[in-house]
Amino acid sequence: AMVRSSAKNYAGVAIVTDPEDYAPLLAEMKANAGALQLATRFGLAKKAFTHTARYDSMIANWLTGLDEGAEAKPAEAAPVPAIFPAKLQLAFDRTEILRYGENSHQSAAFYRETNPVAGSIAAYSQLQGKELSYNNIADSDAAWECVKSFDAPACVIVKHANPCGVAIDGTLLGAYEKSFKTDSTSAFGGIIAFNGEVGIDVVNAMNERKHFVEVLIAPSFTAEAKTALAGKTNLRVLVVPISRVLNTLEFKRVGGGLLVQTPDDFTAQASGLKIVTKVQPTAQQIEDLLFAERVAKFVK
């Protein structure tokens, strides 16, 4: 209430809700005998209302999604929100203005959820390289979601939002070599994601092939690997915490609306297969088909 009240009276009040504003505000006050310009106070008021709106939307989402009769449950039992509330409020923070969108004539930006799911691409930290583009982020998300679905050491190479090489092996090096051989032509200029710590052996293998990539993603990199990669100043290297947790909901914009669904978290098991052909597949063939089924869900 105090934040809203202060924002309404921005003509004579400066309300600060973002610690990032402290330094520039102090500098302006120092340059203006302790005063802030009206334009600055107006900007702070807009930021304050954005802050309270986000807070209110999170509360509204929670309360709207409560099961009927939730108030009658014991106090110690936390109510469980419904999957699809009657009204949906979304809160995102803009983190980057991108050079352009999917095409060069489109403008674009990247927004991060206020509380992103652990292990999602939005949680990335960039170790080196040029700034990410719209397509870099989209392709990186496709590669990361695919590679983190595997328990065994895995490597996924994505080009134009589709996996062109996916492999698992006893080591990340073996997985990389297999995935590269899947389509060695499309592998160039793509995105590579690993689900384990990348060592110098993997970097050396990439260098031997003169494998040019746009983005390299992994949960971590060894010190030797970081040193070897540092010379590739244009290569974008991202670190993302590994987690197999999926987004609670998936969204797709349509004209004037929003399609919402739960994520495709189904993984077929050999025990659940029904073989209807006269020729029975071998155990290896079944294993290969289960692998293909897991990868197919990430093909656009």
State the predicted function of each range:
Residues 19-73:
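Internal, active-site/partner-interface "lid" segment
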Residues 14-18:
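Short acidic-hydrophobic, aromatic-tinged amphipathic segments that line or gate anion-handling sites
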Residues 1-3, 8-12, 22, 56-61, ...:
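ATP-dependent carboxylate/acyl-activation modules
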